[in-house]
């Protein structure tokens, strides 16, 4: 229902307009206060790159964070990552991730980023505290990438990158809750880069698509072509589950059942195992896999995806970030 409201297919969005105007007024006032320096943002001693979005829901932001971190690491840059840690609840904050940190403590996306990149990752509702925790333990960190936080104006940033779903884009264009917008589309004029996940990019936007890798068995780590798996049940607890199901079909998989779950939904063995019958194979997203690995069955697999950016702009962006991190 919410997708139909936000896309404008359902007329119910008009009933929510008063709340949207209030949301827009408050969020706009907050940003204006920082812009006019009525409130002061905290500036880190190292450059900060924000990877965020203008809309609620999944846009492919986390794969972009992983891509950025890996690309900078390949250039010899030491990168730290901070996040709000949505979906997790730590005993205390800030929380610096380790090999033993669970998604229940840190949230699924920070754990995924940590496992993928081996970069220092910290979570906290106050991102400045997360940055301080990283720099205290890892003084060699040269640049911070923040996963989400475009609207977290308490944190000063040097570069802003926005990720857009190229198919859904901005829906009906209205602020939450009548539409999907955290900020209106005009905000794009002030950011440093706009990355478009799928769809047809517009002038000045960087095209991106998610490239699936081999399926990985959660229990054994065995890899295989996902099309070799039979009697597949697909599960996705991400911001936009249909994207994952479409990726599977693109890979030649015709799932017998597709199970969309809420983003950041808590998972347990009983609930997940109930999704498959004898002889069926469960295929999930990598984000779900970090929550299920501890209690996985032998017939559970996940399909990792990597961000692939096209054109000349990604190289220019990386050169800019490398120069920033190097102090040039």
Curated annotation (Swiss-Prot):
> Where, in this chain's numbering, is ATP bound?
55-62
Q: Which UniProt keywords apply?
A: ATP-binding, Kinase, Lipid A biosynthesis, Lipid biosynthesis, Lipid metabolism, Nucleotide-binding, Transferase
Q: Return the EC number.
A: 2.7.1.130
GO CC entries:
plasma membrane
Is Calcium given among the entry's keywords?
no
* Keyword presence, Nucleus: no
Catalytic activity field: a lipid A disaccharide + ATP = a lipid IVA + ADP + H(+)
Q: In which pathway does it act?
A: Glycolipid biosynthesis; lipid IV(A) biosynthesis; lipid IV(A) from (3R)-3-hydroxytetradecanoyl-[acyl-carrier-protein] and UDP-N-acetyl-alpha-D-glucosamine: step 6/6
Example GO BP = lipopolysaccharide core region biosynthetic process
Q: Which GO terms describe its molecular function?
A: ATP binding; tetraacyldisaccharide 4'-kinase activity
Q: Which InterPro entries match?
A: LpxK, P-loop_NTPase
What this protein is reported to do is described as: Transfers the gamma-phosphate of ATP to the 4'-position of a tetraacyldisaccharide 1-phosphate intermediate (termed DS-1-P) to form tetraacyldisaccharide 1,4'-bis-phosphate (lipid IVA).
**According to its UniProt record, which protein family does this protein belong to?**
Belongs to the LpxK family.
The protein, known as: Tetraacyldisaccharide 4'-kinase
Which species is listed as the source? Escherichia coli (strain SMS-3-5 / SECEC)
Q: What gene, per UniProt, encodes this protein?
A: lpxK
């Amino acid at each position: 229902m919410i997708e139909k409201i936000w896309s404008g297919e359902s007329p119910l969005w008009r009933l929510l307009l008063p709340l949207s105007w209030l949301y827009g007024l408050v969020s706009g006032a907050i940003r204006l206060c920082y812009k006019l320096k009525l409130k002061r943002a905290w500036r880190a001693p190292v450059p900060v790159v924000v990877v965020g979005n203008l809309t609620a829901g999944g846009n492919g932001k986390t794969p972009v964070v992983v891509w950025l971190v890996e690309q900078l690491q390949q250039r010899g840059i030491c990168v730290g990552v901070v996040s709000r840690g949505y979906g997790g609840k730590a005993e205390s904050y800030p929380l610096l991730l380790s090999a033993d940190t669970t998604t229940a403590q840190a949230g699924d996306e920070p754990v995924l980023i940590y496992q993928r990149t081996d970069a220092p990752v910290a979570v906290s509702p106050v991102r400045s505290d997360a940055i301080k925790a990283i720099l205290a333990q890892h003084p060699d960190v040269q640049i911070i990438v923040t996963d989400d936080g475009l609207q977290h104006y308490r944190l000063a940033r040097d570069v802003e990158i926005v990720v857009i779903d190229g198919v859904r884009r901005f829906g009906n264009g209205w602020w939450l809750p009548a539409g999907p917008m955290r900020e209106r589309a005009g905000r794009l004029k002030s950011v440093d880069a706009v990355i478009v996940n799928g769809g047809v990019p517009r002038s000045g936007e960087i095209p991106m698509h998610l490239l699936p890798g081999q399926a990985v068995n959660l229990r054994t780590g065995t890899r295989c072509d996902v099309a070799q798996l039979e009697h597949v049940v697909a599960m996705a607890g991400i911001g936009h589950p249909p994207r994952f199901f479409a990726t599977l079909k693109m890979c030649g998989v015709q799932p017998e059942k597709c199970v969309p779950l809420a983003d950041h939904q808590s998972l347990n063995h009983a609930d997940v195992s109930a999704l498959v019958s004898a002889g069926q194979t469960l295929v999930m997203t990598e984000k779900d896999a970090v929550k299920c690995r501890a209690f996985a069955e032998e017939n559970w697999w996940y399909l990792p995806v990597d961000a692939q950016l096209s054109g000349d702009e990604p190289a220019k962006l990386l050169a800019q970030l490398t120069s920033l991190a190097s102090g040039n």
